[in-house]
Amino acid sequence: MSVRLATPRTLVRPAGEADATALWQFRMENRQHLAPWEPLREERYYTQGHCAQTIADWRESIRLDRGYPFLVLDPGEREVIGTFNLANVVRGVFQACHLGYAVAQRWQGQGLMREALESGLDWAFGPLGLHRVMANYMPRNERSGKLLERLGFEREGYAKRYLCIAGVWEDLIAGLQR
């Protein structure tokens, strides 16, 4: 799949084999920053070999139309600013997916993920042909809630003990896009 979405300050595209080191650097530099918002990770998650396998798995997910993981890069493609995934794609009468995302600590608060996600959502509702994109966030993750709100997501409900994040079953606010 050769999707390249350029925004004024980012380039959004699927990861290729050559991106394993950049993904590893992103994971290592943001390990503590992202830990409160992610599942518990085994130590091997933070190896270059695991990053290479992750990219291979992502590419297979795209091939099977099950998910569309993207890197958010600086325009020169030197650094991973963040990642997002249009995951758990369901076709047929539903035409929907779940959105997940992460942004590097040093890039947060600059509107870069909003820019990248606007581009990705336009692609999801356009060429990908989705009707619904769902996103959930933990109530204490106010930054995530504000980002989703700016992207036009509307609160749909409150799911108690919905996902195991950082070893704890967390409540999530459920939302949808358009």
Model region roles, listed by residue range:
Residues 1-22, 26-36, 69-178:
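Acyl-donor (CoA/ACP) binding surface of acyl/acetyltransferases
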Residues 33-56:
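Conserved GNAT-fold acetyl-CoA-binding loop/helix
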Residues 43-44, 56-71:
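A short helix-loop-beta-strand connector motif used in the catalytic cores of GNAT acetyltransferases and
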